Amino acid sequence: MVIKPRLKGGLALTNHPIGAKEFVKRQIDYVKSQDKYEGPKKVLIIGSSSGYGLATRISLAFGAGAETIGVAFEKGVEGKRAGSAGWWNTIAFNEAAKKEGLVSKNFIGDAFSMEMKDDVIKFIKEEFGGKIDLLIYSLASAVRTDPIDGVTYRSALKSTTKDITGPTINFEKEVMEETTMGVATPDEIKSTVKVMGGEDWKLWIEALDKGGVLSEGFKTVAYSYLGPKVTYGIYKEGTIGAAKRDLEHTSDVLNDFLKEKYNGEAYVSLSKALMTKASAVIPIFPLYAALLYKVMKEKGIHEGTIEQKHRLLTQMVYGNNPVIDEERRLRPDNWEMREDVQAEVEALWDKVTPDNFKEISDYAGAREEFMQLNGFDFDNVDYDADVDLEELAKLKP
């Protein structure tokens, strides 16, 4: 069948398997064009199939020669449904890793469950050398079932103070439109913290510690985002902000524990604003990202997902140039948050309208990045060619 892009707002309803392979290849090519670095040898990535988690896995495997385990919730071919983008990203990563002689193992399922934790620990003990050096926590999910009380919680993208109305980009209609984010109830705030906070990260570390599979000097990093003033209503003062504060508190608790027992470390890393499957559906964010891209590209400091994560790993987590703020957070968003960058973005924000947003922002770049997340808009992929889903269905991550 021929697969064409279908969108609904900030969601892609279709994904292109051949495009996904190109998406992964380009990131691998970037890492291979850079110097190799001394990093961890055995890595577990929770949320490994797209965005920040996938880029991290690519950097560690192809830049530092790490053996990797990825955990992700993705779907394969079902009838005429071509499977999720993350499914194909994972298969493409596997194929490339195998060619380089790199060990790559994937667990597809619910990362929040204790069964998944048990399965991963069993594999580490029996087939992965018995220990891991690094855990990256890069999970984006709207739903979590607490494995302890069995209750299913759903996150809510809402304000915690007042209704927030602001402009955003609708990629489906290619228009800038107003969007309103309502105020969360106390239960919605609690549920968002349960899904997007630090509880599951902590459960993973506790399970791995109990299983005896953490190495001396073990590190763990969870990915987060803060952003500038224009996004504070959503992030800092929203339900996401409450969850991220919980994540930061968890980082401190884990750091104390790991330092004492393993001479290890735990950090939250604040990422640069980028189009990911998670961020594309957040109100206001796509417009901010499009304006930011324009400013950062003009200054020659724009980074895509792979460049950002490669710099984080080579310079900060495993390098000599960590940028750490007073709250003990790694700050690879430091170029985005530069005063000159933010001043120019704010000036554009004040000028942007539904009529001029494509001209005064890097809308084209932001949209291309969004489409490429789902395997579309690559100039060397034939999107009119027939895709044999029956053959592709035989491939497994």
Write out the residue ranges for each language-model feature.
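Class I SAM-dependent methyltransferase Rossmann-like catalytic core
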Residues: 1-38, 186-190
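Canonical Rossmann dinucleotide-binding motif of NAD(H)/NADP(H)-dependent dehydrogenases/reductases
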Residues: 29, 34-73, 77
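Rossmann-fold scaffold of SDR-type NAD(P)-dependent oxidoreductases
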Residues: 46, 132-141, 152, 168, ...
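Glycine-rich phosphate-binding loop and adjoining beta1-alpha1-beta2 segment
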Residues: 65-105, 110
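A glycine-rich helix->loop->beta "capping" turn
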Residues: 105, 119-149
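The beta1-alpha1 cofactor-binding region of Rossmann-like NAD(H)/NADP(H)-dependent oxidoreductases
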Residues: 109-120
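Catalytic loop of short-chain dehydrogenase/reductase
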Residues: 155-262, 270-293
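C-terminal helical subdomain
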Residues: 253, 264-269, 286-393
